[in-house]
A protein has these predicted regions:
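Residue-level hotspots at or immediately adjacent to binding/recognition sites across diverse folds
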Residues: 21-363
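Bacterial N-terminal signal peptides
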Residues: 7-17
Protein backbone atom coordinates (compact mmCIF):
# COMPACT_ATOMS: atom_id res chain seq x y z
CA UNK A 1 0.00 0.00 0.00
CA UNK A 2 1.45 3.42 -0.95
CA UNK A 3 2.06 6.15 1.59
CA UNK A 4 -0.72 8.22 0.02
CA UNK A 5 -3.37 5.59 0.72
CA UNK A 6 -2.05 5.10 4.26
CA UNK A 7 -2.32 8.84 4.85
CA UNK A 8 -5.86 8.99 3.47
CA UNK A 9 -6.89 5.98 5.58
CA UNK A 10 -5.53 7.66 8.71
CA UNK A 11 -7.35 10.89 7.89
CA UNK A 12 -10.60 8.99 7.41
CA UNK A 13 -10.35 7.38 10.85
CA UNK A 14 -9.48 10.66 12.53
CA UNK A 15 -12.24 12.65 10.86
CA UNK A 16 -15.09 10.21 11.42
CA UNK A 17 -14.86 10.73 15.18
CA UNK A 18 -15.73 14.43 14.76
CA UNK A 19 -18.88 13.83 12.70
CA UNK A 20 -22.21 12.52 13.86
CA UNK A 21 -23.70 9.41 12.29
CA UNK A 22 -27.05 11.19 12.08
CA UNK A 23 -25.54 13.63 9.58
CA UNK A 24 -24.92 10.94 6.96
CA UNK A 25 -27.40 10.89 4.08
CA UNK A 26 -27.77 7.13 4.02
CA UNK A 27 -29.09 5.64 0.76
CA UNK A 28 -29.48 9.04 -0.90
CA UNK A 29 -26.17 9.08 -2.77
CA UNK A 30 -25.66 12.63 -1.52
CA UNK A 31 -22.71 13.91 0.48
CA UNK A 32 -22.66 14.21 4.23
CA UNK A 33 -24.33 17.39 5.54
CA UNK A 34 -23.07 18.58 8.89
CA UNK A 35 -22.57 21.71 10.95
CA UNK A 36 -19.14 20.23 11.67
CA UNK A 37 -18.19 19.83 8.01
CA UNK A 38 -15.42 22.43 8.33
CA UNK A 39 -13.87 20.30 11.11
CA UNK A 40 -13.60 17.18 8.94
CA UNK A 41 -10.45 16.18 7.08
CA UNK A 42 -9.95 18.51 4.12
CA UNK A 43 -7.78 17.14 1.32
CA UNK A 44 -7.43 20.14 -1.01
CA UNK A 45 -8.16 23.86 -1.41
CA UNK A 46 -8.25 26.05 -4.51
CA UNK A 47 -8.38 29.85 -4.59
CA UNK A 48 -9.85 31.77 -7.53
CA UNK A 49 -9.90 35.53 -7.02
CA UNK A 50 -11.40 35.97 -3.54
CA UNK A 51 -13.24 32.65 -3.37
CA UNK A 52 -11.81 29.46 -1.88
CA UNK A 53 -13.30 26.03 -2.59
CA UNK A 54 -12.24 23.09 -0.44
CA UNK A 55 -12.97 19.35 -0.64
CA UNK A 56 -12.58 16.46 1.76
CA UNK A 57 -13.91 13.20 3.13
CA UNK A 58 -17.52 11.99 2.74
CA UNK A 59 -17.98 14.18 -0.36
CA UNK A 60 -17.70 17.36 1.69
CA UNK A 61 -17.31 20.54 -0.40
CA UNK A 62 -17.05 23.96 1.23
CA UNK A 63 -16.72 27.51 -0.07
CA UNK A 64 -15.41 30.66 1.61
CA UNK A 65 -15.72 34.25 0.43
CA UNK A 66 -13.72 35.75 3.32
CA UNK A 67 -10.39 33.93 2.96
CA UNK A 68 -11.26 31.08 5.29
CA UNK A 69 -12.88 32.91 8.20
CA UNK A 70 -16.25 31.26 7.53
CA UNK A 71 -17.35 28.33 5.38
CA UNK A 72 -20.56 27.36 3.58
CA UNK A 73 -21.20 23.73 2.68
CA UNK A 74 -22.33 22.88 -0.85
CA UNK A 75 -26.06 22.30 -1.15
CA UNK A 76 -25.99 19.25 -3.41
CA UNK A 77 -23.08 16.87 -3.97
CA UNK A 78 -23.99 13.45 -5.48
CA UNK A 79 -20.98 11.71 -3.96
CA UNK A 80 -20.27 10.21 -0.53
CA UNK A 81 -16.65 9.10 -0.74
CA UNK A 82 -13.38 11.03 -0.37
CA UNK A 83 -12.62 13.88 -2.76
CA UNK A 84 -8.93 14.54 -3.38
CA UNK A 85 -8.57 17.70 -5.48
CA UNK A 86 -10.51 20.74 -6.69
CA UNK A 87 -10.01 23.56 -9.18
CA UNK A 88 -12.06 26.56 -10.31
CA UNK A 89 -11.27 28.34 -13.58
CA UNK A 90 -13.85 31.12 -13.12
CA UNK A 91 -16.33 32.40 -10.57
CA UNK A 92 -18.80 29.73 -11.73
CA UNK A 93 -16.91 26.81 -13.33
CA UNK A 94 -15.34 24.34 -10.88
CA UNK A 95 -14.25 20.70 -10.96
CA UNK A 96 -13.48 18.20 -8.19
CA UNK A 97 -12.11 14.65 -8.34
CA UNK A 98 -11.92 11.74 -5.96
CA UNK A 99 -12.35 8.05 -5.29
CA UNK A 100 -14.20 5.67 -7.64
CA UNK A 101 -12.57 7.65 -10.48
CA UNK A 102 -15.16 10.36 -9.94
CA UNK A 103 -15.17 13.78 -11.61
CA UNK A 104 -17.66 16.37 -10.33
CA UNK A 105 -18.58 19.66 -12.00
CA UNK A 106 -20.22 22.85 -10.74
CA UNK A 107 -21.57 25.73 -12.82
CA UNK A 108 -22.57 27.93 -9.87
CA UNK A 109 -19.28 28.41 -8.05
CA UNK A 110 -19.45 25.29 -5.93
CA UNK A 111 -23.00 25.40 -4.53
CA UNK A 112 -24.32 22.46 -6.55
CA UNK A 113 -22.45 19.65 -8.27
CA UNK A 114 -23.10 16.96 -10.86
CA UNK A 115 -21.19 13.85 -11.88
CA UNK A 116 -19.36 14.14 -15.19
CA UNK A 117 -17.55 10.81 -14.95
CA UNK A 118 -17.17 7.87 -12.58
CA UNK A 119 -16.12 4.23 -12.55
CA UNK A 120 -17.17 2.62 -9.28
CA UNK A 121 -15.67 -0.71 -10.36
CA UNK A 122 -12.20 0.84 -10.43
CA UNK A 123 -11.43 0.77 -6.72
CA UNK A 124 -8.97 3.66 -6.67
CA UNK A 125 -9.04 7.45 -6.85
CA UNK A 126 -8.27 10.25 -9.20
CA UNK A 127 -5.69 12.29 -7.29
CA UNK A 128 -5.35 15.55 -9.21
CA UNK A 129 -7.03 17.72 -11.84
CA UNK A 130 -5.72 20.58 -13.94
CA UNK A 131 -8.02 22.60 -16.19
CA UNK A 132 -6.16 25.01 -18.45
CA UNK A 133 -9.45 26.78 -19.17
CA UNK A 134 -13.18 26.00 -19.04
CA UNK A 135 -12.85 23.52 -21.94
CA UNK A 136 -9.48 21.78 -21.71
CA UNK A 137 -8.16 19.71 -18.84
CA UNK A 138 -6.66 16.49 -17.57
CA UNK A 139 -7.12 14.29 -14.50
CA UNK A 140 -4.59 11.79 -13.17
CA UNK A 141 -4.70 9.18 -10.44
CA UNK A 142 -3.81 5.80 -9.05
CA UNK A 143 -2.26 3.04 -11.17
CA UNK A 144 -1.39 5.43 -14.00
CA UNK A 145 -5.02 6.31 -14.76
CA UNK A 146 -5.48 9.52 -16.74
CA UNK A 147 -8.26 11.19 -18.77
CA UNK A 148 -8.50 14.43 -20.71
CA UNK A 149 -11.27 16.65 -22.03
CA UNK A 150 -11.53 19.34 -24.68
CA UNK A 151 -15.21 20.16 -24.21
CA UNK A 152 -15.48 21.15 -20.57
CA UNK A 153 -15.97 17.60 -19.37
CA UNK A 154 -18.93 16.59 -21.50
CA UNK A 155 -16.59 13.86 -22.67
CA UNK A 156 -13.59 12.49 -20.79
CA UNK A 157 -11.37 10.25 -22.90
CA UNK A 158 -8.39 8.11 -21.98
CA UNK A 159 -4.92 9.56 -22.47
CA UNK A 160 -1.59 7.84 -21.82
CA UNK A 161 0.67 9.77 -19.47
CA UNK A 162 2.71 6.66 -18.67
CA UNK A 163 2.84 3.20 -20.25
CA UNK A 164 5.07 1.85 -17.47
CA UNK A 165 4.09 -1.78 -16.79
CA UNK A 166 4.41 -1.05 -13.07
CA UNK A 167 1.39 1.31 -13.37
CA UNK A 168 2.82 3.92 -11.00
CA UNK A 169 0.43 6.32 -9.30
CA UNK A 170 0.23 9.79 -10.84
CA UNK A 171 -0.01 12.09 -7.85
CA UNK A 172 -0.22 15.62 -9.19
CA UNK A 173 -0.76 17.43 -12.50
CA UNK A 174 0.02 21.12 -12.95
CA UNK A 175 1.32 23.68 -15.43
CA UNK A 176 2.97 27.06 -15.21
CA UNK A 177 3.53 30.15 -17.31
CA UNK A 178 7.12 30.01 -16.06
CA UNK A 179 7.99 27.07 -18.35
CA UNK A 180 6.97 27.12 -22.00
CA UNK A 181 7.45 24.88 -25.02
CA UNK A 182 9.17 26.00 -28.21
CA UNK A 183 5.68 26.75 -29.56
CA UNK A 184 4.94 29.05 -26.64
CA UNK A 185 2.54 26.68 -24.85
CA UNK A 186 2.65 26.39 -21.09
CA UNK A 187 4.36 23.11 -20.27
CA UNK A 188 2.28 20.63 -18.27
CA UNK A 189 3.81 18.34 -15.64
CA UNK A 190 2.76 15.20 -13.78
CA UNK A 191 4.60 14.13 -10.63
CA UNK A 192 4.35 10.44 -9.85
CA UNK A 193 5.84 7.38 -8.22
CA UNK A 194 9.36 5.96 -8.66
CA UNK A 195 10.80 9.42 -9.25
CA UNK A 196 9.08 10.02 -12.56
CA UNK A 197 8.14 13.45 -13.90
CA UNK A 198 6.09 13.52 -17.10
CA UNK A 199 6.12 16.58 -19.38
CA UNK A 200 3.66 17.61 -22.10
CA UNK A 201 4.12 20.52 -24.52
CA UNK A 202 0.74 20.08 -26.25
CA UNK A 203 -1.78 20.39 -23.37
CA UNK A 204 -1.68 16.73 -22.46
CA UNK A 205 -1.98 15.12 -25.89
CA UNK A 206 1.46 13.49 -25.66
CA UNK A 207 3.93 13.02 -22.83
CA UNK A 208 7.65 12.52 -22.30
CA UNK A 209 9.08 11.04 -19.11
CA UNK A 210 12.03 12.46 -17.17
CA UNK A 211 13.64 9.97 -14.79
CA UNK A 212 14.99 11.93 -11.83
CA UNK A 213 16.82 8.80 -10.59
CA UNK A 214 14.95 9.27 -7.32
CA UNK A 215 13.17 6.03 -6.48
CA UNK A 216 10.53 7.41 -4.12
CA UNK A 217 7.17 9.03 -4.79
CA UNK A 218 6.91 12.64 -5.95
CA UNK A 219 3.86 14.45 -4.55
CA UNK A 220 3.74 17.91 -6.12
CA UNK A 221 5.85 20.54 -7.82
CA UNK A 222 6.12 24.08 -9.09
CA UNK A 223 8.11 25.82 -11.83
CA UNK A 224 10.49 28.55 -10.69
CA UNK A 225 11.46 29.75 -14.17
CA UNK A 226 12.16 28.28 -17.60
CA UNK A 227 15.02 26.13 -16.30
CA UNK A 228 14.26 25.44 -12.62
CA UNK A 229 11.68 23.40 -10.72
CA UNK A 230 10.95 22.46 -7.12
CA UNK A 231 9.45 19.00 -6.56
CA UNK A 232 8.20 17.51 -3.29
CA UNK A 233 9.32 13.98 -2.47
CA UNK A 234 9.07 11.49 0.37
CA UNK A 235 10.42 11.93 3.90
CA UNK A 236 10.73 15.70 3.65
CA UNK A 237 12.80 15.70 0.46
CA UNK A 238 12.64 18.84 -1.71
CA UNK A 239 14.12 18.18 -5.14
CA UNK A 240 15.69 21.28 -6.71
CA UNK A 241 15.91 20.53 -10.44
CA UNK A 242 17.98 22.70 -12.78
CA UNK A 243 17.73 22.01 -16.51
CA UNK A 244 20.79 22.80 -18.62
CA UNK A 245 18.77 24.30 -21.47
CA UNK A 246 15.22 24.93 -22.61
CA UNK A 247 14.88 21.47 -24.17
CA UNK A 248 14.69 20.01 -20.63
CA UNK A 249 16.66 16.97 -21.77
CA UNK A 250 19.59 17.38 -19.37
CA UNK A 251 19.41 18.46 -15.76
CA UNK A 252 21.14 18.52 -12.41
CA UNK A 253 19.37 17.68 -9.18
CA UNK A 254 19.98 18.73 -5.60
CA UNK A 255 18.04 17.58 -2.54
CA UNK A 256 17.29 20.34 -0.06
CA UNK A 257 16.96 19.45 3.62
CA UNK A 258 14.26 21.33 5.55
CA UNK A 259 15.09 19.77 8.90
CA UNK A 260 12.21 17.29 8.97
CA UNK A 261 11.32 13.85 7.62
CA UNK A 262 7.59 14.44 7.24
CA UNK A 263 5.82 13.93 3.93
CA UNK A 264 5.30 17.24 2.09
CA UNK A 265 1.94 17.85 0.46
CA UNK A 266 1.60 21.24 -1.27
CA UNK A 267 3.78 24.09 -2.55
CA UNK A 268 2.76 27.64 -3.49
CA UNK A 269 4.61 30.79 -4.52
CA UNK A 270 4.20 33.72 -2.13
CA UNK A 271 3.73 37.36 -3.09
CA UNK A 272 7.28 38.15 -1.92
CA UNK A 273 8.76 35.56 -4.29
CA UNK A 274 9.43 32.87 -1.69
CA UNK A 275 7.78 29.44 -1.65
CA UNK A 276 5.66 27.93 1.12
CA UNK A 277 5.28 24.17 1.62
CA UNK A 278 2.77 22.31 3.78
CA UNK A 279 3.35 18.88 5.27
CA UNK A 280 2.16 16.23 7.64
CA UNK A 281 2.66 16.43 11.40
CA UNK A 282 2.17 20.20 11.54
CA UNK A 283 5.00 21.07 9.14
CA UNK A 284 5.16 24.41 7.32
CA UNK A 285 8.35 25.37 5.44
CA UNK A 286 9.32 28.53 3.57
CA UNK A 287 12.05 28.44 0.91
CA UNK A 288 13.94 31.60 0.01
CA UNK A 289 15.79 30.74 -3.20
CA UNK A 290 17.40 34.17 -3.50
CA UNK A 291 19.03 34.06 -0.07
CA UNK A 292 19.22 30.24 -0.02
CA UNK A 293 17.51 29.75 3.34
CA UNK A 294 14.86 27.41 4.68
CA UNK A 295 12.53 28.31 7.54
CA UNK A 296 10.50 25.49 9.08
CA UNK A 297 7.79 25.45 11.73
CA UNK A 298 6.47 22.28 13.30
CA UNK A 299 3.18 23.46 14.72
CA UNK A 300 2.30 22.49 18.26
CA UNK A 301 -0.98 20.92 17.17
CA UNK A 302 1.01 18.43 15.01
CA UNK A 303 -2.00 18.23 12.68
CA UNK A 304 -1.28 17.09 9.13
CA UNK A 305 -1.66 19.80 6.48
CA UNK A 306 -2.76 18.97 2.95
CA UNK A 307 -2.91 22.44 1.39
CA UNK A 308 -1.84 26.02 2.07
CA UNK A 309 -3.02 29.42 0.79
CA UNK A 310 -1.45 32.83 1.46
CA UNK A 311 -4.00 35.18 3.03
CA UNK A 312 -1.77 38.20 3.66
CA UNK A 313 1.78 38.95 4.79
CA UNK A 314 2.74 36.15 7.23
CA UNK A 315 -0.84 34.89 7.45
CA UNK A 316 -1.58 31.53 5.86
CA UNK A 317 -4.68 29.35 5.67
CA UNK A 318 -3.99 25.66 6.23
CA UNK A 319 -6.28 22.73 5.54
CA UNK A 320 -6.02 19.08 6.47
CA UNK A 321 -6.68 17.03 9.56
CA UNK A 322 -9.53 18.56 11.63
CA UNK A 323 -10.37 21.13 8.96
CA UNK A 324 -8.87 24.61 8.72
CA UNK A 325 -6.54 26.83 10.74
CA UNK A 326 -4.54 30.02 10.28
CA UNK A 327 -0.77 30.11 10.64
CA UNK A 328 1.96 32.69 11.21
CA UNK A 329 5.67 31.90 10.96
CA UNK A 330 6.48 34.84 13.28
CA UNK A 331 4.09 33.51 15.92
CA UNK A 332 5.73 30.10 15.62
CA UNK A 333 9.19 31.63 16.02
CA UNK A 334 8.13 33.74 19.01
CA UNK A 335 6.47 30.77 20.70
CA UNK A 336 9.59 28.68 20.21
CA UNK A 337 11.99 31.36 21.49
CA UNK A 338 9.82 32.38 24.45
CA UNK A 339 10.98 30.12 27.28
CA UNK A 340 7.87 30.98 29.32
CA UNK A 341 5.50 29.87 26.54
CA UNK A 342 3.58 26.62 26.95
CA UNK A 343 3.32 26.27 23.18
CA UNK A 344 4.73 23.12 21.60
CA UNK A 345 5.70 24.97 18.42
CA UNK A 346 9.16 24.19 17.06
CA UNK A 347 11.00 26.55 14.69
CA UNK A 348 14.28 26.53 12.80
CA UNK A 349 15.95 28.59 10.08
CA UNK A 350 19.16 27.79 8.26
CA UNK A 351 21.07 28.21 5.04
CA UNK A 352 20.39 25.61 2.36
CA UNK A 353 21.60 22.19 3.40
CA UNK A 354 22.03 19.73 0.57
CA UNK A 355 21.58 16.05 1.32
CA UNK A 356 23.99 13.58 -0.24
CA UNK A 357 22.42 12.48 -3.51
CA UNK A 358 22.12 8.73 -3.98
CA UNK A 359 20.50 7.74 -7.32
CA UNK A 360 17.46 5.47 -7.00
CA UNK A 361 17.35 5.91 -3.23
CA UNK A 362 13.70 5.60 -2.18
CA UNK A 363 13.98 7.23 1.26
Amino acid sequence: MSIFFKIISLFLLLSISSLFASDFNYDTGLALKSNLADKATITSMNKHNDKIVAVGVHGIILTSNDMGVSWIQAEKVPFTNTLTDVQCVSESQCWAVGHDLTILHSVDGGKNWSIQYDDIDFDAPFLSIHMTDYLNGIVVGAFGKSLKTSDGGENWISTVVTDDAYEPHLNSVYSSEKMKSEDGNNLMFVAGEIGQVHISSDQGVSWNMVDTEYFGSLWDGISVDQKRKLILGMAGKILYVKFSDETLNEFSLDTLFAGIKNSLTDIKKLNNGNYIISGNGGVITILDLENETTETCIRGDRLSNTSVIEVSNDKYLLSGEKGFRFHSMRDCQNNFEDKSSISKDMWMKSEFQYEEWVPYDWQ
